[in-house]
Regions:
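Serine-esterase "nucleophile elbow" of acetyl-processing enzymes
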Residues: 1-41, 45-46, 53-63
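Structural recognition of the beta-strand scaffold that forms the well-ordered cores
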Residues: 3-5, 35-39, 65-70, 101-106, ...
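Oxyanion-hole/transition-state-stabilizing segment in secreted/luminal serine hydrolases
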Residues: 16-19, 45-86, 110-111
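Helix C-cap/helix->beta junction micro-motif
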Residues: 30, 96-100, 135
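Generic structural signal for well-ordered alpha-helices
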Residues: 52, 89-93, 125
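Glycine-rich phosphate-binding loop signature in dinucleotide/nucleotide-binding domains
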Residues: 58-64, 98-100, 182
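Active-site segments of SGNH/GDSL-like serine hydrolases
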Residues: 70-74, 93-123, 149
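Catalytic His-Asp segment of secreted/periplasmic serine-dependent ester chemistry enzymes
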Residues: 109, 113-182
Length: 182
């Protein structure tokens, strides 16, 4: 089995040393699974689509392949509306579904709700959650796990959008709840 993760800097593990991002922590916890991390700092959802298409250009559908898609924060920070981000993510999921099973990751909160942008992120996440349920995709709710920890007073962010080591560890635990059941 392989789990291929596509996303932005949060998928890559920005702001922590290599090995401490959520994908690498999952990889270390599941030795029998092959992980690939295609997280790119600053990536837009259109960039994710481009990367996904390039990656999949020589691949056929594989029932033992799971493709995790998580992106959108950079688009929101650049002023994109929730419907635009959602529609692009649906397109990414459609492309991914041609190569394997789809897992949707819901982006973590924008800490401090910079200029009300967290509200846009919540709208995208809710639409994605509903979409994932209707398509039968697994959904990893990274938003809630970090939001709840933040509400309890835990320091889980290194900045406005990037988790710190504790935040990435919580994200890994949440992902493993899904990944270990595949």
């Amino acid at each position: 089995m392989e789990i291929i993760c596509f996303g932005d800097s949060i998928t890559r593990g920005y702001d922590v040393r290599f090995g401490l991002g959520w994908v690498e922590l999952c990889d270390a916890s599941m030795e029998q699974v092959q992980f690939e991390n295609h997280g790119v700092d600053g990536l837009s959802v259109q960039g994710l689509i481009n990367n996904l298409e390039y990656w999949g250009s020589d691949k056929k559908y594989d029932d033992t392949r799971y493709i995790c898609i998580m992106c959108g924060t950079n688009d929101i920070l650049q002023g994109r509306h929730s419907q635009y981000v959602y529609e692009k993510l649906v397109k990414a999921c459609t492309i991914a579904a041609e190569k394997g099973h789809v897992i949707i990751g819901l982006e973590p909160q924008i800490d401090g709700d910079m200029d009300g942008l967290n509200t846009v992120l919540v709208e995208v996440n809710e639409k994605l959650r509903h979409y994932g349920m209707t398509k039968g995709y697994s959904v990893v709710d990274f938003y809630s796990v970090l939001h709840d920890a933040d509400d309890m007073g835990q320091i889980v962010f290194a900045g406005e959008v990037h988790p710190n080591e504790r935040g990435y560890r919580l994200m890994a635990y949440k992902a493993l709840e899904i990944f270990t059941r595949l």
